[in-house]
Amino acid sequence: MGWVGGRRRDSASPPGRSRSAADDINPAPANMEGGGGSVAVAGLGARGSGAAAATVRELLQDGCYSDFLNEDFDVKTYTSQSIHQAVIAEQLAKLAQGISQLDRELHLQVVARHEDLLAQATGIESLEGVLQMMQTRIGALQGAVDRIKAKIVEPYNKIVARTAQLARLQVACDLLRRIIRILNLSKRLQGQLQGGSREITKAAQSLNELDYLSQGIDLSGIEVIENDLLFIARARLEVENQAKRLLEQGLETQNPTQVGTALQVFYNLGTLKDTITSVVDGYCATLEENINSALDIKVLTQPSQSAVRGGPGRSTMPTPGNTAALRASFWTNMEKLMDHIYAVCGQVQHLQKVLAKKRDPVSHICFIEEIVKDGQPEIFYTFWNSVTQALSSQFHMATNSSMFLKQAFEGEYPKLLRLYNDLWKRLQQYSQHIQGNFNASGTTDLYVDLQHMEDDAQDIFIPKKPDYDPEKALKDSLQPYEAAYLSKSLSRLFDPINLVFPPGGRNPPSSDELDGIIKTIASELNVAAVDTNLTLAVSKNVAKTIQLYSVKSEQLLSTQGDASQVIGPLTEGQRRNVAVVNSLYKLHQSVTKVVSSQSSFPLAAEQTIISALKAIHALMENAVQPLLTSVGDAIEAIIITMHQEDFSGSLSSSGKPDVPCSLYMKELQGFIARVMSDYFKHFECLDFVFDNTEAIAQRAVELFIRHASLIRPLGEGGKMRLAADFAQMELAVGPFCRRVSDLGKSYRMLRSFRPLLFQASEHVASSPALGDVIPFSIIIQFLFTRAPAELKSPFQRAEWSHTRFSQWLDDHPSEKDRLLLIRGALEAYVQSVRSREGKEFAPVYPIMVQLLQKAMSALQ
């Protein structure tokens, strides 16, 4: 086995080349140079190569030998497995056979590569010579290095020693300089402290330099300055305390000089930011304690509880007897709390103003920049947010734990809101006047530089930041109580209405009941007047109240047929409608009076209520509209009966100057007088009635003139009677108007048309009232009465009745449509004359054509 192992080592492949099974099976041809022996060996290798290759393949394919080819082959593991798997004798025989085959193969390989192996052996001898030479030279190099080391070590050690000595000397010199400076500054500090507050900023500057000298070095154990260090520590504490007192005094008295001096001290000491933070945090903590104390129900009930000593577990809730005193005590505490918030806000705001104006005289750095340089917000924004959050949280906890406080906050919310508004106004006034106080007290003493800055107007109570509303942040703490108050306010407004409109009721509220509703509305608006937004919110509640009243009243209105009859006396439904309208009118007038009596009433709130009152007015109009329609229809029916009378008669020869009016006119006058006395006089809203009856009067006048222009034939006697009717028409519609002249264009047309009855056609066509006062269509229709029967009126040509023609005119209010209808009648007349081969037209025809052309051109 040893020989085999040696053969395997000798036949190893050269470095860098890995041998494979193919190399062993098919060895490279041997070098043919070197004599016959070599040739013989080569021939032997050639003859045995085929058998050797087959032998190797058999070994590789044999499962008994495959384990020996694995990279992780372990002898112990293989031996253990062989003992357990097969007979040991068979395994040994198998292994011996394999070893024998490998020996033969190795022998063949050595014989085949004899020359190569000899060359390798020669190369090993040459390599040993080279290695021996290298070893000699390495020894020489090591000796040279040792000689150089002996020359360098001693100077190096000296340099290290001198360097350490120099460093210690420098440290000693630095320490001595610090000690000397500390001694000098300590001596100067003693003099500055003796100067009192006038030298306090210089003392702070000296302390700041002393702190700088003490940084990064341990000065303990140095006897020469031990007393000075103790003095410096006491001096720093004294300066800090003195500066704090100066700052507190300056903030309390609003003295910018004192505040500026104190801030300069803290800036020199390097504690400006920490001091400001501590001061603001202290104010916030104090305010939170005051809020908690003001809302502490135990503190509020303490005076009343001290008289009667309660036993264990006795509740601190107020008794009915002391509720008034407790409520008064609570609101007194709230007023004191607002005063304290105002005082603290003034101090913090004053502090921020000084910080914004004060600059260090050496570096010229503004103090406010030192505070906000790390991206922090301005101190007053931080403080104000803390105040508003404290109010919100403390109010929430207090009202959750005490039903009395909850009722006080919700029931008397306007009073609480007034305190807030007063606080806000005081803070705004302070903001507007603080700059004047600065200018009045501004000096250059103690380096207090109170110069003007561009952002003087930047103030939290004079908001200029669109993303922050400080007033809203303050009032947000009251949001839950405002919602509860508005809900209760709406209930207070709705309750009296629901009470006076019981289910199944048929009558509107009485005057006393309506007065109660108005008083409730006035009371709610008066209480809400403390704040614009609250007034607007309550006004919306009032608008809802008016809408509820309107809905309840509408349910009482009678819409049956008897509600619009004008034949007999008032029916029950009409009486109820009149009562509802009167009730709505009283509500409308009373609410309008309440709104007008409010001082500084917001326009938006007024518009909200006015919009609701418009619904009341619309309901009143809807309630009387059926009656008005019936009255208008009856008047039209009476006027249209004028065509049943004869106006073709000539002038009477009796010589009586007085011509009686027509029967229809007497009937119309009687009807209008009866309507006013039987129906409209029961309405208490005269202006509302006249606003509606004036429209009926205008319609009546227009209908009268329309039908008067259609009368054919019209004799001289008929003209006199029709003129009398015109005069009586003014008297007939008089009850419907405050003054007949208020009818406007209808009244002017009535007055202008009457003289045309007696004028010649040429004068009628040239009347100045034509076009502006009296429409062309009315005048041309009137001229038809002066034409022969052959010239038919438009309604006669269409074979319409007077009623149908009047309806057509109502359906076609356009003057152009009416003129086109008239033109058709004139054209039909021309055709009839030509068809009978007439020689001339009626004298009035050219005048009518001229007027028609003038009217059409005026429309264009």
Curated annotation (Swiss-Prot):
Membrane topology: Peripheral membrane protein
Modified residues (Phosphoserine): S197
InterPro entries documented for this protein: Cog5, COG5_helical, COG5_N
Region listing for Disordered, in residue ranges: 1-33
Location of this chain's protein in the cell: Cytoplasm, Cytosol; Golgi apparatus membrane
Record's keyword terms, sorted: Congenital disorder of glycosylation, Cytoplasm, Golgi apparatus, Membrane, Phosphoprotein, Protein transport, Transport
GO biological process, one term: Golgi organization
Top-level taxon of the source organism: Eukaryota
Associated pathology: Congenital disorder of glycosylation 2I: A multisystem disorder caused by a defect in glycoprotein biosynthesis and characterized by under-glycosylated serum glycoproteins. Congenital disorders of glycosylation result in a wide variety of clinical features, such as defects in the nervous system development, psychomotor retardation, dysmorphic features, hypotonia, coagulation disorders, and immunodeficiency. The broad spectrum of features reflects the critical role of N-glycoproteins during embryonic development, differentiation, and maintenance of cell functions.
Assembly notes: Component of the conserved oligomeric Golgi complex which is composed of eight different subunits and is required for normal Golgi morphology and localization.
Similarity remark: Belongs to the COG5 family.
UniProt protein name: Conserved oligomeric Golgi complex subunit 5
Organism: Homo sapiens (Human)
Lineage start: Eukaryota, Metazoa, Chordata, Craniata, Vertebrata
